[in-house]
Design a protein with these regions (language model features):
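N-terminal hydrophobic/helix-forming segments and targeting peptides
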Residues: 1-208
Length: 208
């Protein structure tokens, strides 16, 4: 069971990947997908799953012989992280950082000095129509570096973090670096100019 959990976590770098993985597991277990816009035909003994916006999922089973009560179990599909803003590249001297905002209640210091990458959802232009495509860059792209203690003597004393000042992830040198959205496009196997919008988040490359 622990191996299955670690495999699921590794395959779920964003909320969209997590929902897709749970949906696939439920389909394998015999659940039927329902669409919110359709008229539902619910049958006794049936097992059903409904998703919304690719980021939320509800599954339920109907007993064969009615029932006098029901049980509910709930969990988050998402987790605290940093969301990448539109037009994210910020030049900072010889470096390029990405403009991000905090998402959820996180312990910010735990994101520092770790190998980070990017995953999420793209809205793309495809044959004259809008399409959604999940993307997860399989490789370390970013790091949020901490500074040496002689540059921040108060780091161990009730430290508070400012995302825009202290926690913008470092992407690389400004000279010769492939544009960030070009890397995302290549990973998703689409053209950068066909990406119309995105919901992209940082994820840790540390297993588990």
């Amino acid at each position: 069971m622990s191996r299955d959990l670690l495999h699921f976590i590794a395959k779920s770098p964003s909320v969209f990947h997590a929902v897709r993985g749970v949906k696939a597991a439920l389909a394998y277990a015999g659940f039927t997908e329902l669409r919110e816009e359709d008229t539902w035909q619910i049958e006794k003994g049936g097992k059903y799953v409904v998703t919304r916006d690719g980021s939320a999922l509800v599954a339920f089973a109907v007993p064969e012989n009615g029932g006098e009560f029901f049980r509910i179990a709930a969990a988050h599909c998402d987790s605290p992280t940093f969301k990448i803003k539109e037009n994210p590249e910020i030049k900072d001297g010889p470096y390029v950082r990405l403009n991000v905002e905090g998402y959820g209640g996180m312990i910010m210091s735990t994101w520092m000095d770790r190998p980070l990458s990017v995953a999420g959802r793209l809205i793309t232009r495809e044959n004259g129509h809008l399409a959604q495509k999940l993307v997860a860059v399989d490789g370390t792209m970013l790091v949020i570096p901490s500074v040496a203690i002689h540059m921040d003597r108060q780091v161990n004393q009730n430290k508070s973090w400012n995302v825009q000042k202290d926690l913008l992830p470092l992407y690389g040198l400004s000279s010769g670096k492939t544009p960030f959205m070009d890397v995302i496009a290549a990973s998703a196997k689409v053209k950068a100019e066909d990406i119309l919008a995105h919901d992209l988040y940082l994820y840790s490359r540390v297993p588990g």
